[in-house]
């Protein structure tokens, strides 16, 4: 059931005589795309990126021989501006409580808004969804999720599926330089063991944050699967890719704006309701140069085993045991 957002009230806060600095919050991971793909400077508006569609070849020329032509082709892809915003309301009483008790409410709201906008880059760039509703946005025509290179994760063979995804990127002529993983999928790989209970991938640690899979950089984040924002489960648990093919930049950014008048979000006049609003906005420029630079790990085939349920497989003989 959809609920109407309401303003933050002092009843939601703890106001003892002495309050420890800061407010505890659940850590929300940011954007995996922003960490894997290089941010590029952009001006506002659509940005045309030239792409090479034909690769010239060198010709061996003998003494006195004529030189032949080499073919080359160019195309273009468009980086499209995507505007996102977060608007939250608080009551006047919250402002007073924050001033008196030094709760750090304003800093916390600004930080939470920034994290929401960071996650939004992945949610539009990978899943093409409106983060607020969780539904696919009709205004976004292309996302990483549209990639046709897909490997189905089956049973407990999490590592083999990821290796296959990396192989698909290589087969398309790209050198994969990173992987994005759902945290529980990464954890499942990290917990894989041989029949002597030795970890197969000790470099994965517990599979959280920044990891390494056979020397390839990996980053974990819940935005890979789209949870919790996405309305319809995507089953996406891993992305292998050559990340220069995902182009993004920040065209305009408003860190935090205090709004004291009007009706900025359709919930009624602020002064009439004794409220203020805090709004954060950003305009991303987002474009994918070639979907073939990516491969997806689809968790639809995992079945009853489930992510996190790692079985230890007996090798055929001792030579099959990985140290």
Task: Show where each model-derived region lies.
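Protruding loop/beta-arch "assembly-hinge" segments enriched in small, turn-prone residues
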Residues: 1-28, 265-323
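Assembly/oligomerization interface modules of large self-assembling protein complexes
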Residues: 6-86, 293
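Short loop/turn segments at secondary-structure transitions that flank enzyme active sites
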Residues: 55, 94, 119, 185-187, ...
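Short conserved micro-motifs at the rims of enzyme active sites and ligand-binding pockets
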Residues: 60-62, 100, 190-194, 228-232, ...
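Short amphipathic
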Residues: 85-90, 280
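Alpha-helical scaffold segments that mediate packing/assembly in large oligomeric complexes
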Residues: 89-172, 296, 308-322
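Extended oligomerization regions of viral-like shell subunits
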Residues: 151-269, 276, 282, 311-314, ...
């Amino acid at each position: 059931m959809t609920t109407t957002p309401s303003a933050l009230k002092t009843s939601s806060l703890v106001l003892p005589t002495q309050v420890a600095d800061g407010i505890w919050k659940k850590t929300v991971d940011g954007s995996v795309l922003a960490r894997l793909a290089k941010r590029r400077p952009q001006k506002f508006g659509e940005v045309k990126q030239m792409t090479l569609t034909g690769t010239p070849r060198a010709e061996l020329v003998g003494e006195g021989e004529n030189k032949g032509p080499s073919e080359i082709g160019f195309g273009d892809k468009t980086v499209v501006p995507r505007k996102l915003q977060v608007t939250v309301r608080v009551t006047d009483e919250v402002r007073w409580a924050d001033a008196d008790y030094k709760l750090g409410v304003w800093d916390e709201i600004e930080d939470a808004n920034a994290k929401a906008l960071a996650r939004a880059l992945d949610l539009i760039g990978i899943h093409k969804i409106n983060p607020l509703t969780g539904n696919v946005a009709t205004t976004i025509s292309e996302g990483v999720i549209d990639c046709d290179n897909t490997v189905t994760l089956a049973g407990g063979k999490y590592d083999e599926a990821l290796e296959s995804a990396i192989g698909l990127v290589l087969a398309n002529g790209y050198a994969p330089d990173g992987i994005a993983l759902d945290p529980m999928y990464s954890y499942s790989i990290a917990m894989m063991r041989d029949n002597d209970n030795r970890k197969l991938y000790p470099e994965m640690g517990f599979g959280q944050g920044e990891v390494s899979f056979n020397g390839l950089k990996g980053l974990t984040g819940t935005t890979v699967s789209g949870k919790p924002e996405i309305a319809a489960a995507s089953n996406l648990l891993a992305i292998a890719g050559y990340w220069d093919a995902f182009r993004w930049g920040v065209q305009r950014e408003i860190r935090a704006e205090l709004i004291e008048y009007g009706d900025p979000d359709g919930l009624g006049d602020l002064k009439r309701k004794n409220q203020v609003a805090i709004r954060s906005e950003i305009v991303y420029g987002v474009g994918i140069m070639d979907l073939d630079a990516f491969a997806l790990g689809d968790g639809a085939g995992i079945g009853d085993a489930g992510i996190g349920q790692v079985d230890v497989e007996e090798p055929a003989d001792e030579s099959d045991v990985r140290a």
